[in-house]
């Protein structure tokens, strides 16, 4: 059954509007272990999510094929389900006819390179890591993957959109060992061109990270000036990104629900959601509802400018939809496209040089389990380095970093200029925080 036929059949069953979201994804993953091929996995997934609207109520069904009998059964189930729904807020479908921005094509050349070439690349990566030091005893997670996605959205209101993209990912971990202690350093690269993979950078970063962790000790409990590595700052921003969602506001799960126009963050904090951000891997012209995407400030100079909205939450709050509707199991929620904290002017090393006695946090574990997205509180096991006289002094591990996201964002003293190139979803540069609580020995 074609997408148009699905829509026609849904309307015949009494639905006022019907939308079809067809998604195709392919991934090939090659893993190497001790110079030998460990696994080669190929995944191909296809799904069709069908939404039906009647009397302001929206129902959802999903099929894994377009086989006539399967789709007809799903449509009958959808029509019955919508009738039985008891929705509290009306839902909507977006009409066609909007103008959409042009975005750069993101298509990888991985099909031009044979599998054997990719395996040899991984072998060379593993060999180069082992050659870095006698203390590097093994290479783990030596992996290469290819990813392809295609989406088509069509509805009975004239919407007909499609997008596709593909990219490759390579990463590896160097395991270093000394005096009975084993640590790991990871690095990777996301790219579209196989020949542009930054293998030398992966080798240098993974080996240096692993070797620098050897001999890690403890630190005294106290409050310290803290520098968050960009990876850690990104994890933190990502973990609390739901506070900017209109869905969270609708469920009263964010303190920002009624804070538009109010100063909640520090003067130097600017947080944007920009579907066209040049440092992001994927740029989008429309969301999963077909609404045009646009660049917007969520926080500007510390002032909350607005939240991310779907058609449903925008209607509830009397706002315009922001082009941030994303599908999760058929339903639509408001999520960021490319969310980032705007860069400053200093490099990571320049920021570290401003700290006389503090901590550089390079790794956090169990972040989602140790935070409260409503209050903003977090407690996470961490690792990093002592900073002494503006330089990294010694590695430390197994301490707990505690604080509050909103308080932290009011105590950012320096912002780095090092947002990661080709990031996906959320990004943040290196941040220097005035003080955070550390529980050590």
Set out the residue ranges of the language-model regions:
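Dual-mode signal for accessory low-complexity, basic/Gly-rich regions
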Residues: 259-441
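Active-site bordering "gate/hinge" segments
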Residues: 1-284, 288-291, 300-303, 391, ...
